Amino acid sequence: MDSQQSDLFDTASQPDTVADEYTFLEFNTQGDSEFDYQDFGSPTAWPTPSDSISIADVADRGEGGAAADHHSEASSPSSLSAGAGNGAKVGRGGVGGSGGVSSSSQVDALAAGVGNLNFEETGDDDGFDYGKNDFTEHACKYCGISNPACVVRCNVASCRKWFCNSRGNTSGSHIVNHLVRAKHKEVCLHRDSPLGETILECYNCGCRNVFLLGFISAKTDSVVVLLCRDPCLNVNALKDMNWDLSQWCPLIDDRCFLPWLVKVPSEQEQLRARQISAQQINKIEELWKTNPDATLEDLEKPGVDDEPQPVQPKYEDAYQYQNVFAPLIKLEADYDKMMKESQSKENLTVRWDIGLNKKRVAYFVFPKEENELRLVPGDELRLRYSGDAVHPSWQSVGHVIKLTAQEEVALELRANQGVPIDVNHGFSVDFVWKSTSFDRMQGAMKNFAVDETSVSGYIYHQLLGHEVEAQMVRNTLPRRFGVPGLPELNASQVNAVKSVLQKPISLIQGPPGTGKTVTSAAIVYHMAKQGQGQVLVCAPSNVAVDQLAEKISATGLKVVRLCAKSREAVSSPVEYLTLHYQVRHLDTSEKSELHKLQQLKDEQGELSSSDEKKYKNLKRATEREITQSADVICCTCVGAADLRLSNFRFRQVLIDESTQATEPECLIPLVLGVKQVVLVGDHCQLGPVIMCKKAARAGLAQSLFERLVTLGIKPIRLQVQYRMHPALSEFPSNSFYEGTLQNGVTIIERQTTGIDFPWPVPNRPMFFYVQLGQEEISASGTSYLNRTEAANVEKLVTAFLKSGVVPSQIGVITPYEGQRAYIVNYMARNGSLRQQLYKEIEVASVDSFQGREKDYIILSCVRSNEHQGIGFLNDPRRLNVALTRARYGIVILGNPKVLSKQPLWNGLLTHYKEHECLVEGPLNNLKQSMVQFQKPRKIYNDRRLFYGGGAGMIGNDNFGSGNPNADRRGSRGRAGGSYLPSGPPNGARPGLHPAGYPIPRVPLSPFPGGPPSQPYAIPTRGPVGAVPHAPQPGNHGFGAGRGTSVGGHLPHQQATQHNVGTIGPSLNFPLDSPNSQPSPGGPLSQPGYGSQAFRDGFSMGGISQDFLADDIKSQGSHDPYNMADFATQASPGGFAVDYATQGAHGAFPGNFMNQNSQGGYSRFSGINDFMSQEYMAHGGQGLFTQAGFIDSSQDDGQQNPYGVNNPNLQSQGLPNSLYSQPFAHYNTQPLNLSGPQQSQPNQSSQNPKHPYNG
């Protein structure tokens, strides 16, 4: 390409990141190519074939090549001469065939001539509608460009549409956009293109997957060859020929085909083309799935691709709730059905076996890398055989009972008859889609709306976001909170158990390694001992349910683990607790008859109709007998709607890992009569997986836990982590948990003896291994891989194994499925030790490793490019999960030049650099890297996390709506606004933590003179044991009973942020007037807050700028990365949210979602099930005061409105042993005292919060 064309290409190819919302499929291959390792030497940029280069003909392959040609209607490339990448002329025969060798000037002249002919100005045509009607058959279906040298045909038989190599307004070329979205992989060049009508395919094996194809230049001759990455490049298919395999380069670079292969349209052509946005591309591609002949004009028809109503923070009633969520569940169900039914595999090789239950089991390999869907045990598949001369056609449905690390699937068949066990080849497999889980979600929402007994009135209103008086469950607390069979609880765990037992609805936030499961088991134990009936324990995944069931069983409670029938054959660590196991091993008189019938059924495969009826009745009676005798029933959230529990009612429900479940999924166990619910999870880690992007954009990916947090229900945070080496927990604690995580393990406990691994800093078992290799698109087209990182992962694994670490201690994790599959194959091929050792190493995606841990973690980041960003590595929750899986040590491989552009990653890299753990070079001679970091970009909200929000143009100090759930997709700011890239999900936004998590709207007192919030004016929903309360005069709304409300002076001591360790400098300023409070429209939007605030809320030493300043003045210093400098943000409702910069050194941990410092409870009296409860005045401190509310209708004695005889009961500022600061000075005024704070003149006319009697 000449310099002029290069300039035009650069100008026309800038990605419109505002428009491109298809963020998951970011698959750029542009980037730094400075390979420091001999495995994959590469020039600085992808080489462009020079003059007189020829592409070898597939028909002229060497002896090692495939014999068969893969010609269809088009020829394979035979010979190519290219003038500096300007184009090529293909001969139809041997080298220099009929076309001969054409010069670059001829090609340029031809291209210029075509351009002049097609795009001449016509005076009355403004160019906007060019290509609207696709004048030629080969015009790009997106933009209408029809230059033969610039267009490519999708060669899938059902498609055969043409697309150009122009980006237009998207971040990738139109042809690559189409291939990815449609999941197509074959292309053919135009017959009038310089290369002729050519199907791109591998020279050696004929593979036509363009995402696998690259080219190699010969060492001596001016010839290039197309070769696929896997298997031909990886197995060195051309080792006996004169090819330099180290110079292999992919055909798709920076989301475009290489310009010497498919020209990029000129700037003039692109300006005259139809302008199409990424959103329009997404919509037309979706439409083509059902109507292949649809055009862009069809998108404008009413009812086409309407966005569903987004999830709300609050709902008027359960019917509105159902009307919002039901369409989203249907969208997800339809997408799941379409995806599963479209996934099929042909020509499988099957090996046969017989299971312990005498059923046939088929084993076959089902590669994960090529599939968007992940198989899990219990999935239904249909195995088919088309038949041959000897065997008839056959098919049978079965359940997946096992998945191996080598991607082998064990499928247990339902029927044993007619199975072709003497055949091993030529099988096909399809998914069998079942709607059970989606049907149960819809049913739960219906019950929630129509059945008043489905949940208590209080929980009903809390779930809908209505403001009701806080209540307290009347329970006798145990003398001690320790539980037999479990480890001794620490102070924050005891605090969580104590608080949960007395509240109708509770949230427990468990950061990594803090003992969520142990705490949950302790809560369940105490609930069961209260004698209020059986406790239902759920989680979204079977693994989480099994872990919790095992812990609860260890306490001595009788536990039944209810499995889906499709999973009864799946091996489980708690097999002895499962219902089907207990049915088989129950020793009763009826059992003997049931056992005989079961044995008969296993042997014969079926029973007579009378025996079958008798068998089912006996089995059903036995199951009911076992479940009724249990103290605790454990199942998945979806499993709670199992017919075997249809007549059960559960007053108390605990849902573990609730942040990984969708809201309708959480609702299933709640509508079984719940009166007390506990949600356990961590919204700072990854949430539920939603496959349908339209449903995810509307908010289905938001968990119930997150929504309740945004509504002001404060999670109780567990604060002592027992997993990570203290050096490993430092950054996650400071960046994701405000420095509040304390270490329950010492450095000595996390040092291993006899392990000789070359850590750069001996007492810090961590380092960032600098990699500058190129990222590439995976075979699926929807993921990435990085061959350089994969090669060095193998070197690291080998070094760990040689140093004495066993394979089961090592975990390799990566965000991308393409890299996961490549690492598995690479280690199997290239590992220098025994192959079996590498097979035992677990290689997994970051998302699938949530909740897991290993002694040593190797994290491969993959992304390495100049322009395309880092994809969903942007998500701070994914980084949090990745950094917190290791117990003893972690190694991160990545490209700092690319990762440092994102502020959070910049902080991580700075942290590693300051501790001398940023290294490069060979493993046996690591040295500190001097690589220069990029200036971090400003980060804003992302639709993947902020539901209803999106990128756009806003003014520098304009955050738009103060509603955290407001839909701002169409927002555009005033002239002079700053550009918002469609970017990472850790942007600052009202009502959201700067790292991307919802924050509670809770009052920070004292703030006299603020506006009260009004109670939700709705009818009550039946009594739940509450007592009417008289409103307190002079103190109304959300802050009632908690000191003064928002809006007045902020005492100096509450605004001061103290230095804690090396977290960073502090903010130290009083707010002297109400006018200095941040506005509800945008947190930290005032310049006065800017001395240490970075754009996304993360603070780095040395940065001095406005929160919304456009210019980053400096970067990095001796101060580690700190995200705790958030003093006094305002929530959308006008209530201040206090982020205290406190660290992990024993000081009080601040006010963000922290209730672990409850110092104690006052005595209470009363005869009701639920007692009212108020936070103390310093709302963030998490102290509760509880007073006895005595129903005045039953006691005529002299009582004040709160039923408290001794006002001093209200001031319980007990010091907590967890923290070094006593806090007795908070809330020293009794709530019913009419002090000066309560008599603000502007409050006298406000409506008080009405008592709630439902």
Curated annotation (Swiss-Prot):
Disruption phenotype: Seedling lethal. Increased expression of not only protein-coding transcripts but also many mRNA-like nonprotein-coding RNAs (mlncRNAs), including natural antisense transcript RNAs (nat-RNAs). Dwarf with curly leaves and late flowering. Photoperiod-dependent altered development and stress responses; in long days (16 hours light), altered organ morphologies (e.g. narrow and epinastic leaves with wide petiole, small rosette size, long seeds, some abnormal flowers and stunted stem growth), disturbed homeostasis of wounding-induced jasmonic acid and pathogen-elicited salicylic acid. The keyword Cell membrane does not apply. It is found in: Cytoplasm; Cytoplasm, P-body. Residues 497-629 form the Helicase ATP-binding domain. This is Regulator of nonsense transcripts 1 homolog. Zn(2+) 3 binds at residues 202, 205, 228, 232. Pfam families: AAA_11 (PF13086), AAA_12 (PF13087), ResIII (PF04851), UPF1_1B_dom (PF18141), UPF1_Zn_bind (PF09416). The helicase ATP-binding domain is implicated in early steps of nonsense-mediated decay (NMD). ATP binds at residues 493, 513-517, 685, 722, 853. Its main location: cytoplasm. Disulfide bonds: none annotated. GO terms for biological process: defense response to bacterium; jasmonic acid mediated signaling pathway; long-day photoperiodism; nuclear-transcribed mRNA catabolic process, nonsense-mediated decay; response to wounding; RNA splicing; salicylic acid mediated signaling pathway; sugar mediated signaling pathway. It comes from Arabidopsis thaliana. Residues 140-174 are annotated as: C3H. Induction: Down-regulated upon Pseudomonas syringae pv. tomato strain DC3000 infection. Residues 74-83, 1073-1092, 1236-1248 have a biased composition (Low complexity). It catalyses: ATP + H2O = ADP + phosphate + H(+). Residues 84-100, 1036-1046 have a biased composition (Gly residues). Residues 202-232 are annotated as: C4. Zn(2+) 1 binds at residues 140, 143, 164, 174. It comes from the Eukaryota. The keyword Transmembrane helix does not apply. Belongs to the DNA2/NAM7 helicase family. Highly phosphorylated in S/TQ-enriched N-terminal and C-terminal regions; required for formation of mRNA surveillance complexes.
